[in-house]
Amino acid sequence: RDDVESRGLGDVYKRQVIPRDVWENCSAALLKAEENWGIVELGYQFPESDRDAGKIKLVSFQDFCPYIIDLDEYKYARESFTLDEWIDIILGAIDYNAAGYESRQQKLAMITRLLPFVEKRLNLIELAPKGTGKSYLFGSVSRYGWLSSGGTMSRAKMFYDVARRTEGLVFGHDYVALDEVQTINFTDIDEMRGALKGYMENGKYTVGNHEGAADSGIILLGNIPAASMNEYLNMFSDLPKVFHESALIDRFHGFLKGWELPRMNDDLKICGWALNSEYFSSIMHELRDDPTYRAVVDARVAVPEKSDTRDTEAIKRICTAYLKLLFPNVQHPEDISSHDFNLFCLKPAIEMRSIIKIQLGILDPEEFGGKTVPELSVKDVDE
């Protein structure tokens, strides 16, 4: 036949048709991604006989997307900007006005939230005052992530539903952010804790006879009172009981001090020209698959003997994510100075992991009391 029919998806889809000439004109745009936005024009195709039913036909499709994702072009473009200019570009791409921040530190604190957008299986905890934009950023910036707010969370919903034979949230998402985590009810604490520990360690999960793997990061987002904004106090006491175990907390790579971010105000809302948000979220998604940056980190980071493996891996993952965000043009160890690598990648990664280590000492002093992260340092490129 001269038509391309939708088959195997139920009777409704059998009554839809794409004429051959329309398919030839639109197929490239329709198939370039798993999801596409565009303007669709539909028409009615009359039946060939009284015994047949009419069909809805596609007349035309106009792609909304005004760009093509070219990762190499994006990397090359970074060389045309200073670091401060690039930081402002990133903030504009996520709908924030860089001029509304009081300091570079505040800007970098906001950009730190994007680490799990660019690095696979990066697990983070952020506690912050209300109104700092946690829900918006993790729920609206990228279509590749998932924000779950309050309610009930089960192993079936997170990993795999045996009854329905469907994959859970970690499958097919870049991250799963549990917003207002203090209000989430976990149906079976021991079951959920065991599943999380296994997945956060190696990216694999087993539910019944089903074995799965995914690349989604796990993000905990919670509100914290001003009196508890101290990394040397127990900041995790209000978290659900499932997270009151040191072995699980140890699998979170870093902690974000959300209180370093300003409360959302009108001055922080984007105005004027900015990088397209959908384009930027797609770029971040593509960066997850680029192994170049981890190779640079491995070459530039000196690891002391007998360093704790989880600490080292956590710091390197966070460091890699910072490198992708702030210096995407870096493709070789010598492409970034030791000063910039240490100040903007390694040092903040160590600080984020150190807070997890301090909290572990408070939560489980017998196992982690007095322990610190290894003293990783920057190697010169000629070493």
Q: What is the role of each PLM region?
A:
Residues 2-13:
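Single conserved hydrophobic/aromatic residue that forms the stacking wall/gate
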Residues 17-68:
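Phosphate-/polyanion-interacting regions in eukaryotic proteins
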Residues 54-101:
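Charged, amphipathic alpha-helical linker segments immediately N-terminal to NTP-binding catalytic cores
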Residues 86, 188-192, 276:
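Phosphate/oxyanion-binding active-site loops and adjacent basic polyanion-contact surfaces
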Residues 91-95, 118, 253:
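Amphipathic, well-packed alpha-helical segments that form the structural scaffold of globular domains
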Residues 98-233, 250, 373-376:
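Conserved ASCE/P-loop NTPase catalytic core
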Residues 211-218, 223-326, 330:
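Phosphate-sensing "switch" segment of ASCE/P-loop ATPases
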Residues 298-383:
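C-terminal alpha-helical "lid" subdomain
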